[in-house]
């Protein structure tokens, strides 16, 4: 909830969580979603694949088609990248002194070992490659 966290922590925590959700669902799709999409995308786009959980509920998440699942994955990754781009210390868009008051307990230490902005961009590229849509990879950022 945005009203509980300050702006910096909100952007980093929500960005990480969205990226981790996409990462987990992508692994599930790779394991249980009919294999590599790049050679058979038209055949597999309409088949039901995995449930994609976007909220916590006692009811099962709906099972989506391949195209819908990929769209949900990329939406999560795009939102995560947008949240992390200007706030993640690893991007160095802000001076190190900006993070000092927030980093009393070391939360921002070792950003290279966490789901950071560059890990999100790498996962986006991995999804596009697996999907067989290499021309969609955003290499500018």
Map each language-model feature to its residues.
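Structured, solvent-exposed acidic/aromatic patches
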Residues: 1-19, 28-141
């Amino acid at each position: 909830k945005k009203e509980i966290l300050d702006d910096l922590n909100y952007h980093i925590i929500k960005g990480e969580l969205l990226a981790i959700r996409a990462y987990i669902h992508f692994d599930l799709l790779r394991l249980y979603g009919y294999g590599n999409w790049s050679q058979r995308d038209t055949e597999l786009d309409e088949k039901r694949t995995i449930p994609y959980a976007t909220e916590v509920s006692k009811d099962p998440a709906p099972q989506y088609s391949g195209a819908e699942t990929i769209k949900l994955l990329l939406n999560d990754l795009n939102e995560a990248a947008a949240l992390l781009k200007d706030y993640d210390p690893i991007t160095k868009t802000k001076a190190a002194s900006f993070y000092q008051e927030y980093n009393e307990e070391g939360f921002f230490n070792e950003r290279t070992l966490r789901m950071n902005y560059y890990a999100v961009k790498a996962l986006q590229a991995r999804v596009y490659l697996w999907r067989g849509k290499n021309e969609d990879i955003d290499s500018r950022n």
